Structure formats: structure tokens, C-alpha cells
Swiss-Prot record:
Forms a fork protection complex (FPC) with TOF1 and which is required for chromosome segregation during meiosis and DNA damage repair. FPC coordinates leading and lagging strand synthesis and moves with the replication fork. FPC stabilizes replication forks in a configuration that is recognized by replication checkpoint sensors. Residues 150-165, 223-253 have a biased composition (Polar residues). This is Chromosome segregation in meiosis protein 3. One of its GO terms (biological process) is DNA replication checkpoint signaling. It is found in: Nucleus. Component of the fork protection complex (FPC) consisting of TOF1 and CSM3. The lineage of its organism: Eukaryota, Fungi, Dikarya, Ascomycota, Saccharomycotina. GO terms for molecular function: DNA binding. Residues 166-183 have a biased composition (Low complexity). The gene is CSM3. Residues 141-254, 275-309 are annotated as: Disordered. Belongs to the CSM3 family.
Length: 309
């Protein structure tokens, strides 16, 4: 082994020193800060502490929301002996202790704000709230609530060909049959259902106005046997009074009622008779030659004389 080989292996070489850099401001010599342990590639960096954050995994852990669901019904109780303020203070204290154990870095107000924003954005927390809601609904309405929500096809009825309109010639008849079947299903269950308002079966005064009118022969028979007046199909009619003897007659000569034109004619005739009667009364007063107001004037003069006027 010669002298060159010894130099290549580093035997007898001088130890390395920090690189000295000439400072342009002071004019002195400064060491290079980027070199650590004589390694120019090493960088001096500080190790940061891990930042603890409030995440969905922390809220769904055993010390998170499951802890509240388990212990809140027992520890958060409202006492009638305490005031409303004391009861509310007792509830808030429970949640403050729970928040401090779960995430002690944040204050209670900041913890509530973080939980609110995280619950709106995280899908796992939304699913957890949905499961809690369904469990509560099952406790109130039974186990069938979840099965109905999970299998909505059980409640929906398949659409058949009879429910769809057809373009054939018999489409109207088929639609009418479907409507009739639907009406029968609806009316068939009215006896077992409870109505919000009681139905007055006896008060059928207005039902005669809306139901179909029987033929004229039956109307004539009813008018002859009773005092009730049926409503005809065409014109608006009124019962016959003593002042209006005219009316619409049936084929057998029975008077049913007067039409609208006959009513107007009867009113006009009555007005004419009244005017004629007044004219005749005035004519009788003129024939006697005595003014109707003269007797009253004479009585007034006699009364004034008695009083001394």
C-alpha cells in the first residue's frame, strides 16, 4: 500500500471544519448555519407538537355522543322543587363536564360551535342522527316504522293497465268502471271510519234542492196528497198563493206552480189593481165635495177656541 492509497482512505488527513463565510456587512468571518455536523445537506427544523382536532371519530367514540345518550337520561333530571334557572344550570353543567373531558382544549362556547359545523358537513354524524331519530320513532310507533321506511315498495301499489287511459273506443267505459270501483271502496269503509264532524242524517232540508226531481206525474200526485211543493226541473217556480191563482198545469190539469213570467204578470196585475183602487177612492172623495183635510182643520179650530186663542 503506497502513500496515495493511504490518502484515498483518509488516513492521516486533517479533520473537516465548518465552512467559513465572509460577512459582507461586518467584514468578518461567519459560519454557515445550514451545515449541521459538517453535513451541507442537513436542515435545522423544529418538530411541531401534534394539533388535536375535534373530528367525527372523536364525537362517535365511546366518550362522545354515545356517552351522552347513555348517561344523560339519568343525570339530567328536572326537579319540580328547583326553579327553572336551577334546572337549566344543572343541564348545562352536565354538558360542560362532558365537553371538557372530550375536548379540553376548547371552551364550551367554541365546542358547541365546532360540533354544530361538524354535524352539518360530516356524513357519519348525519347518519348517526338519522339512526337516533328512527330508533325514537320505533319506540313511539312500533317496529313497523323502520320496515316501512326501508321497504317503501311494500306500501306502493303497482300501476295496472286498468288505471291508465286508453285511446280505444271503450276507454270511457273502462275509466268509468275504475271510478265506480274506487267509489265503492271509499264508500264501503265509511261505517268503520271516524269522522271529525258528526253527520246530521235527520237534517235533510237542503237535500231536496240538490237531488234529482221525479217526473211531473209524481209531482202532481204529491201536490194533491200533501202540502209540500217539489222543485221542477226547468224554470224556477214558487208555490201558488191566493193572490196568484195562475200557474203551470200538468197534463191532467193539476196546478204545479207558476213560472217566472207568470209571476211578473201577476205582480203587474196586482199593482194595476191597487192603482185603480186608489183612483176610485180619490174619486169618491171628490164626489162628496168634502176635502179629507177639512174635518181635521175644523177639529183644530174648535180646540183653539176652547183654549182661548
Amino acid at each position: 500500500m503506497d502513500e496515495d492509497d493511504m490518502l484515498m482512505l483518509g488516513v492521516g488527513a486533517e479533520p473537516t471544519q465548518h465552512a467559513e463565510i465572509e460577512d459582507p456587512l461586518t467584514g468578518g468571518v461567519a459560519s454557515d448555519p445550514t451545515m449541521i455536523n459538517d453535513d451541507p445537506t442537513a436542515v435545522n427544523a423544529k418538530v411541531r407538537r401534534p394539533q388535536v382536532k375535534l373530528t367525527a371519530e372523536r364525537l362517535l367514540s365511546p366518550n362522545g355522543l354515545p356517552y351522552v345518550m347513555k348517561h344523560a337520561p339519568k343525570r339530567v333530571r328536572i326537579s319540580k322543587s328547583r326553579s327553572t334557572y336551577k334546572n337549566l344550570e344543572h343541564i348545562i353543567q352536565f354538558y360542560q363536564l362532558w365537553a371538557h373531558e372530550l375536548f379540553p382544549k376548547a371552551k364550551f362556547k367554541d365546542f358547541v360551535r365546532l360540533c354544530n359545523s361538524l354535524g352539518k358537513t360530516d356524513a357519519d354524524l348525519r347518519n348517526y342522527r338519522t339512526e337516533l331519530f328512527r330508533a325514537d320513532m320505533e319506540n313511539q310507533f312500533g317496529d313497523g316504522y323502520r320496515s316501512d321506511k326501508q321497504n317503501p315498495a311494500n306500501n306502493s301499489q303497482p300501476v295496472t293497465s286498468t288505471q291508465l287511459p286508453n285511446n280505444d273506443a271503450n276507454s270511457n267505459d273502462e275509466n268509468n268502471n275504475v271510478e265506480n270501483d274506487t267509489n265503492q271502496l271509499i264508500t264501503g269503509g265509511q261505517e268503520t271510519t271516524r269522522h271529525l264532524f258528526a253527520r246530521d242524517e235527520e237534517d235533510d232540508d237542503d237535500s231536496d234542492l240538490y237531488r234529482s226531481v221525479p217526473p211531473p206525474s209524481s209531482i202532481a200526485h204529491e201536490s194533491a196528497t200533501s202540502n209540500t211543493h217539489a222543485v221542477p226541473t226547468s224554470d224556477t217556480t214558487l208555490p201558488i198563493s191566493d193572490n196568484n191563482p195562475k200557474g203551470v198545469t200538468n197534463s191532467d190539469g193539476t196546478v204545479i206552480g207558476i213560472s217566472e213570467e207568470d209571476e211578473l204578470l201577476a205582480m203587474e196585475e196586482e199593482l194595476n189593481n191597487y192603482a185603480t183602487q186608489k183612483i176610485e177612492e180619490l174619486g169618491d172623495d171628490k164626489d162628496t165635495g168634502i176635502d179629507p183635510g177639512e174635518e181635521e182643520d175644523e177639529d183644530a179650530l174648535d180646540a183653539m177656541k176652547e183654549l182661548g186663542f
